[in-house]
Amino acid sequence: PLYSSAASDVYKRQAVYLVGLSVWSMGVGNKVRVGVFQGNGGAQTCIWETIASIQLDPDMMVRTITTGDIANGALRDLDAIIIPGGEGATQYMNLGEENMERIRNFIRSGKGAVGICAGAYLFTDTPGYACMHINGGKAIDIEHDNRGHGISAFSLTAEGKKLFPELAKRDKSYVMYYEGPVLVKSDNIPLPYTTMAIMETDVHEEGNAPANMTNNRPFFIANEYGKGRVFSSISHPEATPGMMWMIPRMVRWTLRMPVVAYSKRVVNPDLYNREILMTKDDLRKERGYYRTFLYGSPNEKIAALDWLQACRSWDAKRWVQGLLFDNSPAVRERAARFIAETDYLPFLSDLEAACRVERDEQTKQSMMRHFEHLKALLPHK
């Protein structure tokens, strides 16, 4: 034969990959094509959660893109790009100046861009910070960026109520905030933005951050950029059960798409109706539960999951995956409930696998209910 069987397999895989790219570039049923940047500086959980949020919209399809993909022309096959949370300057370094100019040209041509937390920071015009200068804002008090995190309150402006009518009658709504930038208008670039929401929570739990810095500041801002649009969120709706749908709605705004209703299973702002900020004592307790999951008894693990879910722990979502396969059926069931009740779609396939291999029939039935509850977030095909 001309090629060895191993080489033949490689060529087959390459052919499948190229066919997949071809299908993606054409779109599926004219779906909007969204790329989530996956590079050094982007937090892995933020990438997972951003992908999951886009999957809630029946008119969108999503993939990850790397800095090499951008250089190779991947933006030609996208309608919108999302820069997720993590560390904005590190994402800047990973992208490189030429790729950032490719992204700017992509937006100028009429496409959309959404920046989440670090992504919003990257979009600013902040002196002394590596950024792209595309959203008309600048960050202040950057020496206290590690100011804290937790479920935080915001209020919508008149324009924000048009984009998020599901929240229009609420005085306040709540999503996860994690050390996002404190924004004011840039002094240097004439790029006006519209404030869609105002932060109502004063976060200064860590890093000797001053009080009254985050409250009454822009929470969501949106602007025109050439023929395209940019939306910047200093918070993490994608990491907030019941509020993940806000991310595809932001994408819709950047592409001038109509507002469409999502199901009641997806839109659930009543899950959080108060601030839940992590204090230093809370953070110490949270860190201790890492060891509990390694060495604790079943009852200790379940108690830890109860507390971590109640306070909407940021770190716990990275720890629960393996608990689906704990030696204790009670722990396995509680881990499944944690994942389902926190709408953690990134672990849907793990939960499905756990259900399939579960040996205890009562536990299996309960876990299957949690699986179906989580799966119900996805639009019907």
What residue spans do the PLM features occupy?
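Amphipathic alpha-helical scaffolding segments comprising HEAT/armadillo-like alpha-solenoid repeats
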Residues: 283-292, 313-325, 344-356, 378-381
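A glycine-rich, often tryptophan-bearing local segment used as a flexible ligand/cofactor-contacting loop or short
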Residues: 89-168
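Extracellular ligand-binding/catalytic regions of CAZymes and related secreted enzymes
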Residues: 32, 104, 131, 217, ...
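Catalytic beta-strand/loop cores that center a nucleophilic Ser/Cys/Thr
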Residues: 152-226, 234-241
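Short inter-helical turns and helix N-cap capping residues of alpha-solenoid HEAT/ARM repeat scaffolds
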Residues: 296-297, 327-328, 359-360
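Single conserved hydrophobic/aromatic residue that forms the stacking wall/gate
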Residues: 1-14
